[in-house]
Amino acid sequence: MKFFAFLVLLALAFSYDGNAAVNYALRYCKNYNPSYNKYPGVDCANFVSQCLKAGGFSFSGCSGKDSKGMLPAVSDLKSCLSKNGWSKSSTRPGAFKKGYPFFMNAYSHAMLATKINSGSVNYAGHTNDRCGDVTISSGVTYYYL
């Protein structure tokens, strides 16, 4: 059974396309995709969910999905990532790449990394719509495969 779980996690790691997620994020970071629900003032997890879907992430087994299959609540997105093989770290791990999600302020805000620099991460996000801004490195929880 452990070997099977390893194969599932390995398949997840190779089926997610971070570049596709970033391309989606940069296309919709300043506007909203009309194909999905909009949550004015609290759209961050919904937007990151859309980016992850564009990258090929499957939300199977996740609770809290809206009518379009996205996760509008940060807590549900965090739980879904953990259930689907993503690890987390309070320091930026070497495995963290562009196209991966991260959270600030004790999981109250979700964003997607659009570029990784030696000392910072550029990101896209909704609520206060951001497109390629640079984030601080404190108070961040990174998710990675």
What are these regions (language model features)?
Residues 13-69:
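N-terminal capping segments
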Residues 16-19, 97-98, 142-145:
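Cysteine-nucleophile amide-bond enzymes
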Residues 64-129:
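...with weaker cross-activation on analogous glycine-rich loops/strands in unrelated enzymes
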